[in-house]
């Protein structure tokens, strides 16, 4: 079994392998059994990370003109929705050359702006290269091979992934740039954000609606924003703005809870609490600038949550939220080198929308 570990906050976490590695391994094993017979229990492949990995082979099916087998997706300690699913490859002999197809459970790209052309199976460029390299090393020079990748549970699993948001229908994507799944990978999440921004821009969305998570998305929908314009950016608002600026997007809407929004008002564009937590300081500062009594400022400063502050302040100091929203708008404009104008919508769980700046 493949074993590779990374250190994350002092914890030893096990890596896994990508759906791309699974597809390449299954394709290589099926091709070898098709041309040279026998039944393999495991197969070794090269991955872009620069190492070899050996993975178990299962569900072997030998037909008159094909061999089909699978690799079980292993995600290590990463909380990956695809962990444990079977990635199948079917190898068939053809007269010459190489052909790659997507079967049941592999998504089909239905929009522009992704790594794969519209109408093609959602098998990303690096996995495509991996599959071709591994199988063509085995196929005799005067022969050819057709590979079909399929994922029986792919359509069901895809509903819980980014694919519906990316206009990929019918299944999951075969992904991976290194061949390895790194637990809690920040890079993987940021890549998903960038991909969604680019895809939506290519499909005609020129004013994206950025939200931090599902709660913000639900609020934005209730306010009448178009769901197709929404992009979940998690803690990476700064990174998302960088991608928007690269695409020369001039206007966005940002809908978020006061807790996250206060951090941006103070210039924090990575909003994870471990990186930045100035929520109460932000509200307290604005209250002080409004000449609120010291005991009010001090009480808010020492509170644990922004929801508690909203409840405590009631409506008497509601101007504070407008001031914070205006600062967020200004911060975004400055952060993007005076290129992106933002509509700001800030809400609390208790009161709903507490500030809106166009």
Swiss-Prot record:
Pfam families: CbiD. Its EC number is 2.1.1.195. It comes from the Bacteria. The keyword S-adenosyl-L-methionine applies. One of its GO terms (molecular function) is cobalt-precorrin-5B C1-methyltransferase activity. It is an enzyme of class 2 (transferase). InterPro entries: CbiD, CbiD_sf. GO terms for biological process: anaerobic cobalamin biosynthetic process; methylation. HAMAP family: CbiD (MF_00787). This is Cobalt-precorrin-5B C(1)-methyltransferase. The lineage of its organism: Bacteria, Bacillati, Bacillota, Clostridia, Eubacteriales.
